[in-house]
Amino acid sequence: MAAQMREPKVVVLGGGSWGTTVASICARRGPTLQWVRSRETADDINENHRNSRYLGNDVVLSDTLRATTDFCEAANTADVVVMGVPSHGFRGVLTELARELRPWVPVVSLVKGLEQGTNMRMSQIVEEVLPGHPAGILAGPNIAREVAEGYAAAAVLAMPDQHLATRLSGLFRTRRFRVYTTDDVVGAEMAGALKNVFAIAVGMGYSLGIGENTRALVIARALREMTKLGVAMGGSPDTFPGLAGLGDLIVTCTSQRSRNRHVGEQLGAGKPIDEIIASMNQVAEGVKAASVIMEFANEFGLTMPIAREVDAVINHGSTVEQAYRGLIAEVPGHEVHGSGF
């Protein structure tokens, strides 16, 4: 009986800013192990209670958080797995995990992106590689550095099984980090992937010096595009005005710490996308998601002008100026049911 009552051990896979922040939160609630590739990062976490590479020297992590570079140790001891690796490495880590992980261990993704080539959401990859393991996503307006510094924030844990979601939500909840639950995994994952593309669009606008009214226009119409595609793919319309949708869209479009907004600004400064990506310390998921989103839009017969223009700049040689001229040239129709910008 005592063994059944013990605190579940959370294993966070990934050493980036958000994975480390979530690992530190979980460590304040119970036993937590973080797997990282870099020995230097592991030593920094274990000895200095910091992840200086991704969170700087000022953010102090929970002193009960332990890091390891031993993947087998992490996989073999996990009661709950939290996936903090980028979308391009997600499947590979899961495949390695499948060799070691016990049955039924829940897998919670932190990734707000889609897999290029298959266009799959992260929970779909979990279901394919780790059948029988409950899969979900923790999503919301969460700039990692702010959460790590203790500013109040919130997220939503999306899982099909609400009893399990409620139980797991307590692992992530603190006095200043609120965690809600939902069963709309599709909506939460699509909102997380889409907002990155739209943040690039807003970043382009910053580089052009657009006004606040124009910025609000782009964000509002982006929410409409996000909702149209998300609902077409099976998401609930109630998800998109919430934390995973509008909340995350606002912070990713407006925060100076937003990687995707930064990409848009750099594109507006005339830098090639490859040069921008090479100069960044972390992944901007919107760069990879833009073409995938347009494939979905074409599949469902949807017109998505903002996503279209971002894809054109990133993948088809268009300029930021041409993108915004293209949006303004759109003829406005019905605000809800119209197909244009």
UniProtKB/Swiss-Prot annotation:
Similarity comment: Belongs to the NAD-dependent glycerol-3-phosphate dehydrogenase family.
Source domain of life: Bacteria
Any one Pfam family match given in the protein's UniProt record, by short name: NAD_Gly3P_dh_C
Annotated keywords: Cytoplasm, Lipid biosynthesis, Lipid metabolism, NAD, NADP, Nucleotide-binding, Oxidoreductase, Phospholipid biosynthesis, Phospholipid metabolism
EC number: 1.1.1.94
GO cellular component terms listed in the entry, alphabetical order: cytosol
Taxonomic path: Bacteria, Bacillati, Actinomycetota, Actinomycetes, Mycobacteriales
Protein name as annotated: Glycerol-3-phosphate dehydrogenase [NAD(P)+]
Binding site for NADPH: S17, W18, R37, K112, A144, R259, V283, E285
Keyword flag Oxidoreductase: yes
Primary location: cytoplasm
Species of the source: Mycobacterium avium (strain 104)
Entry binding sites for sn-glycerol 3-phosphate: K112, G140, K195, D248, S258, R259, N260
Summary of the function given for this chain in its UniProt record: Catalyzes the reduction of the glycolytic intermediate dihydroxyacetone phosphate (DHAP) to sn-glycerol 3-phosphate (G3P), the key precursor for phospholipid synthesis.
HAMAP family attached to this UniProt entry: NAD_Glyc3P_dehydrog
Gene3D superfamilies from the UniProt entry: N-(1-d-carboxylethyl)-l-norvaline Dehydrogenase, domain 2 (1.10.1040.10), NAD(P)-binding Rossmann-like Domain (3.40.50.720)
Coiled coil regions in record: none
Cell compartments where the protein resides: Cytoplasm
Catalytic center residues: K195
Reaction it catalyzes: sn-glycerol 3-phosphate + NAD(+) = dihydroxyacetone phosphate + NADH + H(+); sn-glycerol 3-phosphate + NADP(+) = dihydroxyacetone phosphate + NADPH + H(+)
